Amino acid sequence: MAIKILPPQLANQIAAGEVVERPASVVKELVENSLDAGANRIDIEIERGGVKLIRVRDNGCGINHQELALALARHATSKIATLDDLEAIISMGFRGEALASISSVSRLTLTSRTEEQHEAWQAYAEGRDMAVTVKPAAHPVGSTVEVLDLFYNTPARRKFLRTEKTEFGHIDEVVRRIALARLDVLINLHHNGKLVRQYRPAKDESQYERRLVSICGTAFMQRALSLSWQHDDLSIKGWVVDPMNTEASGDIQYCYVNGRMMRDRLINHAIRQAYQDLLRGEQQPAYVLYLGVDPHQVDVNVHPAKHEVRFHQARLVHDFIYQGVIAVLKQRGSGAELDIACCEPAPAWEPENRPSAGGNHFSRQSNATSVAASSPKEVLSSKGNMGGSRGGENRQYHGDHYQKRQGEVYQKLMQSEPEEKRELFPARTAPVMAEKATSAPVQVKNSNHSFGKVLSIYSPCYALIESPLGLGLLSLPVAERWLRQAQLAPTEQGLKSQPLLIPLKLSLSKEEAGALNRYSDLLGSFGIEASVSHGKATLCAVSLPLRQQNLPKLIPELLGYLAQQPSASAEQVVTWLARHIGSEYETWNVAQAVQLLADVERLCPQLVKSPPDGLLQLIDLQAVVASLTHE
């Protein structure tokens, strides 16, 4: 094949593979553009988890009419102009790829107006060459980006999106991080026409605390220790939670570098080392930290989603964070200021960072100031030192043991005896006619133990099947529930546990924790392994049918159900789980229905012979035939 330049749309779609991972990625890029435009109010409207619509409206500076078409072109940006600008990034965006990439996998419309213009203009790109069309529009000062039908032209990408609830949960988390980074900006988040989140701008100390409480919770603020420390061009501000307070949530782990959300290994390692000797059992550190670094001493152009950075003086930054955090943790009891010089040196850290470009910018001698308690207003007086990441994404675990156990399970599975192959869709032996449909159970006399052939999907969740007895509608959710019930039925050895890659923290009530201890053996037979320590429950493993479920919601609900039972049997747990486990699909296609029925026929052959109520209903075609023949 000859070498040739790719069409603009295809090139943009390739770039979108890195920039646009899911709807939350689009929201992040658009909101960051609004912040770079100087907006102090951002309205976000979402429909169907962002798949149908993402609309971000701001009151920023807007885009000039002459530059509007360039805004949708690749590598066109107002953020940088020279290599020196790239080596000292102070804006959120700088590559000029986001809008072009998003417009190549959606129907994007950009409407904007500057204060100098008397009318607004609207731009959109379409076609193979991504030609931009600009036309007049009505709009106040600022910009609105509307993204319709995300991944409509890349069905493979759209197929791997999760449910509407899951995708909106990712969007909600992104907005939460940005709201914590910029407390001075009003952010409204709507979903399906309803106001879900409203983060009001903070102007004084009480408003700072109120907004932080709305994001991090009251428990975090009540137990947080304020941190403020500066050394030359390095500064760290924020809050760390006293590890002696066992009720503090380890899920709150936000870290920001020069206003950018970060999940950096070096920063995470420094914080965990500071907490190392103070955590008990399965405790996790909780913190909100804002790190300020000279832009010339940090490279943000090392990760497609800008979630990681590289520090030119990595060792100095690591020790600076370590000493600042451990100092405020050690002074928590006495309330007196602690001299930084008395802290022990930080444990060894060997990051994979590039060498320093030029001389050591931080090599000048300076007396480090002591860690001083400060108010939220003082900590956040500079709105540039912000960005965030959740705790679950920062935690590091040694997974060799887990991988070994998973490998053993996989080998045993592969060594099992293969089943006798049989035809999924047997040849039809009777005409497509059926007796008049009744509410009585359908009796299917079929030696092949097959429901028949799936012809089509009716509505969102019914399969139209052709069986030897005629046509019928089969409820796929009911079939899925019976399949789960068969999969969850414990054997003499119990269901095989599969360790979670990252153990899951659960917040349980006293009744739920009591049920966990009381029914630990029963839960173990279903592959559910959990432990309680210091008032917190840790879920370590579940069986295969439960791995893809919403475990933080499912397990507490199961424990709540067990807490209400004077005694519980395995059959009760199986029935409860089968009814409460979420369906893998909201809408079905023929391939998914075929796979489901094949599994049901293999594990539940009795359902083929005698389908229960609500599973299968034959269709009476006699009336239809009579109407067509005018009889």
UniProtKB/Swiss-Prot annotation:
Residue segments, region Disordered: 353-398
Any Pfam family hit: MutL_C
Molecular function GO terms recorded: ATP binding; ATP hydrolysis activity; ATP-dependent DNA damage sensor activity; mismatched DNA binding
Cited PROSITE patterns: DNA_MISMATCH_REPAIR_1
GO annotations of cellular component type: mismatch repair complex
Amino acid composition bias (Polar residues), ranges on this chain: 362-373
GO process annotations (BP): mismatch repair
DNA damage among keywords: yes
Protein family per UniProt: Belongs to the DNA mismatch repair MutL/HexB family.
The protein, known as: DNA mismatch repair protein MutL
